[in-house]
């Protein structure tokens, strides 16, 4: 199996290296082979090639069975032209691979409930999956930069556009995921204001009635969903949402977990999938060996499950992370008195060794 490695910027190299050690351990234990191809993306690609997404990176990603991404961006590239910012590399590879579905699981365990800004009894046991449409909507609609209109008034615009096929394919992902979980989908929109949301709600309801009657469907306005995530996160199973709402809600949900250093994500389409932690490149701690690699390791577990057809290995990797947490090992972002402080590479090694037991 071929994996395209895109460490990217900041802490990306450290966390990807730790995750690769764990993946190698899984391959050894479960009897499969991994071939790696490391490429550039983001700021490091700008420095080396002048663009955030070189053609060689696209070719490698398309030829791979899966892509593992670290993180992109940093203040070093804040003032480059908008069309070559590091984040353009991320958007570009999503488009090149046809990745239209972003999966973000969020769980709060007994080991992390005390980290949540919510009361532990409110947060512990939360287990939800955000299914976000990734390549449509306002981020990919027609844009006009600030300019003077015919009346001499400065204006700018961004178009929110969805088609029926785009809504149907992401909704199907959500319904299928719910069938394997607790059988409940919460579809999020702003149908009281937006025409695109009214179409979204209509299509999702039609699909539930026709193809998924066994799945419970609820519709929430996005503002109510944002509030309910804080008031009662345990009520949610699968949250289905468009691109911009999903971007915001998934970041909100991540704060409930108490640490973005624990949260993985998958971006899927009809071909090669891409896996990455939800946190950023954290350039302020890059190279210090203190970054938390667990979100990247858990992203690899998602890779094993969704792209490499290695469900047993995925379950074992997640269990190894839980075991290491239960043994009291923590990177500095999660460290507290009475626990065992370890570095990025040490955490990766601990999980790998636990997996090999």
Name the predicted role of every residue range.
Residues 31-55, 227-229:
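N-terminal beta-loop-helix "entrance" segment that forms/cooperates
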Residues 9-12, 65, 131, 174, ...:
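Buried hydrophobic positions in well-ordered alpha/beta secondary-structure cores of metabolic enzymes
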Residues 4-21, 25-27, 150-223, 235:
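Glycine-rich phosphate/diphosphate-binding loop of Rossmann-like nucleotide-binding domains
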Residues 47-157, 244-246:
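N-terminal glycine-rich phosphate/adenylate-binding segment common to multiple enzyme folds
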Residues 111, 220-227:
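Short acidic loop-to-helix transition motifs that present clustered carboxylates
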């Amino acid at each position: 199996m071929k994996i395209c490695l895109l460490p990217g910027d900041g802490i990306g190299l450290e966390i990807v290296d730790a995750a690769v050690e764990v993946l190698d351990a899984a391959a050894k234990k479960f009897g499969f082979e991994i071939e790696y191809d490391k490429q550039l993306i983001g700021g490091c690609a700008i420095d080396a090639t002048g663009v955030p997404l070189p053609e060689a990176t696209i070719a490698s990603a398309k030829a791979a069975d899966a892509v593992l991404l670290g993180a992109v961006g940093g203040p070093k590239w804040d003032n480059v032209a908008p069309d070559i910012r590091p984040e353009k590399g991320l958007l570009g590879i999503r488009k090149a691979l046809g990745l239209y579905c972003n999966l973000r699981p969020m769980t709060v365990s007994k080991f992390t409930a005390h980290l949540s800004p919510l009361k532990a009894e409110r947060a512990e046991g939360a287990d939800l999956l955000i299914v976000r449409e990734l390549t449509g909507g306002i981020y990919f609609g027609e844009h006009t930069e600030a300019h003077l209109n015919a009346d001499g008034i400065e204006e700018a615009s961004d178009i929110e556009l969805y088609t029926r096929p785009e809504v149907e394919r992401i909704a199907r992902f959500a319904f299928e995921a719910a069938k394997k979980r607790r059988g409940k989908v919460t579809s999020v929109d702003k149908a009281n204001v937006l025409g695109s949301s009214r179409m979204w709600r209509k299509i999702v309801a039609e699909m539930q009635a026709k193809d998924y009657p066994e799945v419970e469907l609820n519709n929430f306005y996005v503002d109510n969903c944002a509030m309910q995530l804080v008031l009662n996160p345990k009520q949610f199973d699968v949250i289905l949402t468009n691109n911009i709402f999903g971007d915001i809600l998934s970041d909100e949900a991540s704060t409930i977990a108490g640490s973005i250093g624990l949260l993985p994500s998958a971006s899927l389409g009809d071909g090669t999938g891409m896996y990455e932690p939800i946190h950023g490149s954290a350039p302020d701690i890059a190279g210090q060996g203190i970054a938390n690699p667990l979100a990247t390791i858990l992203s690899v577990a998602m890779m094993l499950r969704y792209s490499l057809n290695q469900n047993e290995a995925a379950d074992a990797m997640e269990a190894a992370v839980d075991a290491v947490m239960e043994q009291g090992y923590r990177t500095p972002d999660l460290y507290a008195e009475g626990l065992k402080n370890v570095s990025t590479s040490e955490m990766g090694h601990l999980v790998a060794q636990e997996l090999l037991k």
